[in-house]
Amino acid sequence: MSQKTVKVQLVRSLIGTREDHRATVRGLGLRRINSVSELQDTPAVRGMINKVSYLVKVLA
């Protein structure tokens, strides 16, 4: 059984955002605007994406 994955792209700048939101974006493996990270689809990752949903876009 293969692991399900989710691709996340940073679409907004981190300037002016809360420190814990910046840390969450870094935890998702995103550095620059338009950077893409492919992560395992787990409840923890889903929660991180939900927390910073105004900064990121889910691609797949």
Curated annotation (Swiss-Prot):
InterPro entries reported for this sequence: Ribo_uL30_ferredoxin-like_sf, Ribosomal_uL30_bac-type, Ribosomal_uL30_ferredoxin-like
Matches recorded under Gene3D superfamilies: Ribosomal protein L30, ferredoxin-like fold domain (3.30.1390.20)
A GO cellular component entry from the record: cytosolic large ribosomal subunit
Keyword Transferase set for record: no
Record's keyword annotation contains rRNA processing: no
Keywords, alphabetical: Ribonucleoprotein, Ribosomal protein
Gene Ontology MF, one: structural constituent of ribosome
Gene Ontology biological process: translation
A Pfam family matched in the record: Ribosomal_L30
Recorded superkingdom: Bacteria
Subunit structure: Part of the 50S ribosomal subunit.
NCBIfam families noted in UniProt: rpmD_bact
Membership in a protein family: Belongs to the universal ribosomal protein uL30 family.
Identification of the protein by name: Large ribosomal subunit protein uL30
Species name: Cupriavidus necator (strain ATCC 17699 / DSM 428 / KCTC 22496 / NCIMB 10442 / H16 / Stanier 337) (Ralstonia eutropha)
Lineage: Bacteria, Pseudomonadati, Pseudomonadota, Betaproteobacteria, Burkholderiales
